[in-house]
Amino acid sequence: MTRPMLEALDLAGVRGERRLFDHLTFRIVPGECLSVHGENGSGKTTLLRTLAGFATPAAGRVLWKGKPLRNQWSEYQRELVYNGHGIGLKEDLNALDNLLAAAAIAGEPVTTECVESALDEVGLAEHRHLPFRMLSQGQKRRASLARLLLYRRKLWILDEPSTALDQFGARWLGELIHRHQSRGGMVVLTSHQELALKTSQTVRMGA
């Protein structure tokens, strides 16, 4: 039996004084994708932030390789990519410099050639020197997702990664996630857009 890498044990989450979810338990092994569904305000983002270690659960625990996150915070962050609602890149920098700066902050040694290759894969090679503010929302989202190509991390936590993507972009994202799974990677995501995913588990919030 494959040992779980990420475990949520009897998790509860709150926002303000409102209880968003309670008694959530699941385990993720290499190669799995967990899809989180629910209405707006049901706690999907709170759950993802809790799994990433950015929010403290109201109850329960999150384990990585069988140990609590608080006991291995630095190691866990080196194995995680968290892509939130926001794009997370600077409007005044171009896409190339944005990704180089983001990689440096994340502690990922990448070359300019690697970043250019990632931008080419997401269809932004010709726009790599444009100020980020001049790109469309879909192009900005693709630039943000290009980080997944640069960071060799086991776990991807993606909050609405298909936002602003067209049909081509959504199909590319589904293929990218499938490749990550085939290499033993793990994914936790929320998405309002249907993606062609090999989903192993589903969590329904507010059910």
Swiss-Prot record:
Gene3D superfamilies (alphabetical): P-loop containing nucleotide triphosphate hydrolases
Q: Which GO terms describe its molecular function?
A: ABC-type heme transporter activity; ATP binding; ATP hydrolysis activity
Task: Supply the enzyme class, top level.
Answer: translocase
According to its UniProt record, where is this protein mainly located? membrane
Q: Where in the cell is it found?
A: Cell inner membrane
Q: Which Pfam families match?
A: ABC_tran
State the InterPro entries in the record. AAA+_ATPase (IPR003593), ABC_transporter-like_ATP-bd (IPR003439), ABC_transporter-like_CS (IPR017871), ABC_transptr_haem_export_CcmA (IPR005895), P-loop_NTPase (IPR027417)
Give the domain of life: Bacteria
Catalytic activity of the protein: heme b(in) + ATP + H2O = heme b(out) + ADP + phosphate + H(+)
What is a biological process (GO) this protein takes part in? cytochrome complex assembly
* Membrane topology (UniProt): Peripheral membrane protein
Q: Which UniProt keywords apply?
A: ATP-binding, Cell inner membrane, Cell membrane, Cytochrome c-type biogenesis, Membrane, Nucleotide-binding, Translocase, Transport
The terms describing its cellular component in GO are: plasma membrane
EC id? 7.6.2.5
Q: Where is the ABC transporter domain?
A: 6-207
Q: Where does ATP bind?
A: 38-45
Read off the PANTHER family from this record.
Answer: ABC TRANSPORTER I FAMILY MEMBER 1
- Family the UniProt entry places it in: Belongs to the ABC transporter superfamily. CcmA exporter (TC 3.A.1.107) family.
Q: What does this protein do?
A: Part of the ABC transporter complex CcmAB involved in the biogenesis of c-type cytochromes; once thought to export heme, this seems not to be the case, but its exact role is uncertain. Responsible for energy coupling to the transport system.
Quaternary structure note: The complex is composed of two ATP-binding proteins (CcmA) and two transmembrane proteins (CcmB).
Protein name, UniProt field: Cytochrome c biogenesis ATP-binding export protein CcmA 1
Provide the species name: Cupriavidus metallidurans (strain ATCC 43123 / DSM 2839 / NBRC 102507 / CH34) (Ralstonia metallidurans)
